[in-house]
């Protein structure tokens, strides 16, 4: 079989949610971010696992994602949409009982005119300059918006993965200035904000990457294992090239395994001749270019070539691979290709 196997540990995701939930006070609700197909791991199955663990409020990027999660979970849990109420979203918000996080005066107007009485939340810009009402805009519409009864006031931290960054305190101060005294539940923190401490928690947190085993939640249980099948093995003599552009040449007689995965499957080309795959605990260097469907790996030092090599495992996390590729673990996870056979179960010890 030439299809790689991506194993996803739903119990580990649930355990990570519970661990993050325990970091906050009992009167602080812990939500769950399942946008981008639950960071590439399957929103329907992940949302089910998180709901069983106790999550009651889910966050997605767009209404179409919210509809998928609602189909999976049925009625009950609240599903909040970060992009708010865009033009064309009205039917989805109504039919799938979604809660848009309105982030502009235009969206406020659209929502009140088309879905008056439908639950909504508000995003406020505390300094990231990405989404949300700016302080001046909020001051102008706060009385009207609060009278309509928002479910949540939220903002987002720009530098939460850097605990000592002054922006964290600046945004906390700005958020409090906009929301103190409103009497509405508030949310400022995703995973990084949870780790900053109780001052950033308010009434609701929204962990995302920490659920899926990523930094900055260093104590997270690993969630994914990606095993790539070996398609062919050949002996390469001294001076012979491997792969596109002859970018790697054998300096000694080498055993090269051609493995079924490439940039079409989410492996960045920047891994070319830089990354390692693993045979058990033994690292094996990737040699030559990452191509669309294939990579080549030097397995000369192995006593026997296995049927598959691991690229995500206990010895190389998504963050580790991201460091090698010059990116972040979020990108590695969300780029995991559709060709992988997804298997849900416990990871091998």
UniProtKB/Swiss-Prot annotation:
- The positions flagged as active site in the entry are 35, 244
Keyword match Mitochondrion: no
List of residues that carry N6-(pyridoxal phosphate)lysine: 35
Binding-site list for substrate: 130, 292
Q: In which pathway does it act?
A: Amino-acid biosynthesis; D-alanine biosynthesis; D-alanine from L-alanine: step 1/1
InterPro entries attached to this UniProt entry: Ala_racemase, Ala_racemase/Decarboxylase_C, Ala_racemase_C, Ala_racemase_N, Ala_racemase_pyridoxalP-BS, PLP-binding_barrel
Domain of life of the source: Bacteria
Q: Enumerate the HAMAP family for this protein.
A: Ala_racemase
Explain the purpose of this protein: Catalyzes the interconversion of L-alanine and D-alanine. May also act on other amino acids.
State the name under which the record lists this protein: Alanine racemase
Q: Which organism is it from?
A: Cereibacter sphaeroides (strain ATCC 17025 / ATH 2.4.3)
The uppermost taxa in this organism's lineage are:
Bacteria, Pseudomonadati, Pseudomonadota, Alphaproteobacteria, Rhodobacterales
Provide the gene name from the record.
alr
């Amino acid at each position: 079989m030439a299809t790689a196997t991506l194993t996803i540990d739903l119990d580990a995701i649930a355990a990570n949610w519970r661990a993050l939930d325990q970091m906050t006070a009992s009167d602080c609700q812990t939500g769950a971010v399942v946008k981008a197909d639950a960071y590439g791991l399957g929103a329907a199955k992940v949302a089910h696992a998180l709901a069983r663990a106790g999550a009651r409020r889910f966050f997605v990027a767009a209404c179409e994602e919210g509809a998928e999660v609602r189909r999976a979970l049925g009625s009950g849990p609240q599903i909040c949409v970060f992009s708010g109420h865009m033009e064309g979203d009205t039917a989805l918000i109504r039919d799938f009982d979604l809660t848009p996080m309105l982030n502009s005066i235009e969206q406020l107007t659209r929502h009140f005119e088309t879905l008056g009485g439908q639950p909504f939340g508000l995003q406020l810009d505390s300094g990231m300059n990405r989404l949300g009402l700016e302080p001046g805009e909020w001051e102008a519409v706060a009385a009207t918006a609060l009278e309509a009864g928002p479910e949540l006031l939220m903002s987002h931290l720009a530098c939460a993965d850097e605990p000592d960054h002054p922006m964290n305190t600046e945004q906390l101060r700005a958020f409090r200035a906009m929301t103190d005294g409103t009497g509405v539940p508030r949310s400022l923190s995703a995973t990084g904000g949870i780790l900053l401490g109780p001052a950033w928690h308010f009434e609701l947190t929204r962990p995302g990457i920490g659920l899926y085993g990523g930094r900055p939640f260093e104590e997270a249980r690993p969630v994914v294992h990606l095993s790539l099948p070996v398609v062919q093995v050949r002996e390469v003599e001294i001076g012979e090239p491997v792969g596109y552009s002859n970018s790697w040449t054998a300096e000694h007689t080498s055993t090269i395994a051609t493995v079924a995965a490439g940039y079409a499957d989410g492996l960045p080309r920047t891994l070319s001749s830089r990354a390692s795959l693993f045979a058990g605990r033994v690292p094996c260097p990737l040699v030559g270019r990452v191509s669309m469907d294939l990579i080549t790996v030097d397995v000369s030092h192995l006593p026997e070539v296995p049927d598959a090599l691991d690229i995500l495992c206990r010895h190389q996390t998504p963050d580790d691979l991201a460091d090698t590729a010059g990116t972040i673990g979020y990108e590695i996870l969300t780029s995991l290709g559709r060709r992988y056979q997804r298997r849900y179960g416990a990871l091998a010890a």
